[in-house]
Amino acid sequence: MNKFVIASLNRKGNLVFVNRYYGGTAKTSENIEDAKIYYSPYDAQEEWKDRMGDAKITLGLKDGNVPFIVSVKQVMAKTI
């Protein structure tokens, strides 16, 4: 199982990691240690299916509050 995080792109173009639903709290954090999600890609995609629709994961989001899924490896390597 890969490590996945739920993240959104804010208006400044920075990633904001969200553990609101998976962590059981309502906080958001830019600290990746607080936002790690141990979920399979399939389960994470199903969870956010209504919000994501059929859109591909992209940084070109119009709404900064729309979440997307990135892997921890991508975040750490800054390849997104």
Where are these regions (language model features)?
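Short, mixed-charge low-complexity intrinsically disordered segments
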Residues: 36-80
